[in-house]
Amino acid sequence: MLSLIDRLAAERRLTLEEYEALVAGQSGEAARYAAALADRTRRAVYGVDVYIRGLIEVGNVCRNDCLYCGIRRSNASCDRYALDEETILACCAEGYELGFRTFVLQGGEGATPVGRVCRVVSRIRAAYPDCAITLSLGEYPADDYRRMYEAGANRYLLRHETADRAHYEKLHPHEMSFENRMRCLRDLKAIGFQTGCGFMVGSPCQTARTLAKDLKFIEAFQPDMCGVGPFIPHHATPFRDFPAGSAGQTLYLLSLIRLIRPNILLPATTALGSVSPDGRERALRAGANVIMPNLSPCAERSKYSLYDNKLATGRESAQNLALLREAVAAVGYRVVTARGDVKNP
């Protein structure tokens, strides 16, 4: 197993069967070895810098009915909200004062017409020309993505969720299309966005083979960012009784992704911190180099509930940057306030 990890670190690619063997053969020794190589790899590209992004959860209205998600359309108990433009701008103003130079606007799909997205992006771009603007608002036609890019957005996060069509269809309702999700990712990259994909670890019906396909997809697609976190069930979804994904497997996969794509921007996700008290710090040691503290209005944060028991210790809040800096420094890294664009390999 260690020889496969060595070859991945050297060549940045494996066969699908070799990826499957790596996933299925995970052990404590393999995970520690992969993490050490991943940490060395990220230090060679990014040093000990950890980039922070100010996350603004702009609304939890969603047209989709994904079987794993707490803000799915069918959840009648979800307390819906949508931030107005002035509130979003106020969040950015607070974030800028705190030192953030990237804002991430994330929300349910289909709730924000492209014209409104472009208007908000244009206003943020005019107010903060030195900042990066990341959007994570789901699937749109290519022309809409182009308008967002021309309005001033730099990055777009759209998790592919799984690179296996049959698995995708088990996680999503029939009106959602695996082909369309992949089309969106290709469009985003072609338009010029720094493009991010991602997936859950431990989702229902996931296998070593489907995870191997995720790794092979990342190898082929070469994303600039990749969001990976454990599946965590939400009580108001069809997957409420499934077990959560494992922190250990998530960390191992983060390390493998860093070896596949040395210059990738790899978040230590809130979901990982939610299943393991020191999950985000462990993620940094396993190859992650991005953290996204929450800039959303405090009154709305609990409403953006994608999964149960979302981390709420304080360190995930943008207002507690001092705590975050201390936690990151304690494991040997440094929070920086740069835009943190992807570096050329």
Where are these regions (language model features)?
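Alpha-helix-loop-beta-strand connector modules within alpha/beta enzyme cores
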Residues: 113-137, 177-194, 242-264, 316-328
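Catalytic cores of alpha/beta
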Residues: 141-148, 204-218, 274-285
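Glycine-rich, proline-tolerant flexible connector loops at the mouths of alpha/beta enzymes
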Residues: 53-56, 76, 104-115, 166, ...
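Canonical Radical SAM [4Fe-4S] cluster-binding loop centered on the CxxxCxxC motif
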Residues: 46-87
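Short, small-residue-enriched loops and turns at beta-alpha junctions
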Residues: 59-60, 109-113, 174, 202-207, ...
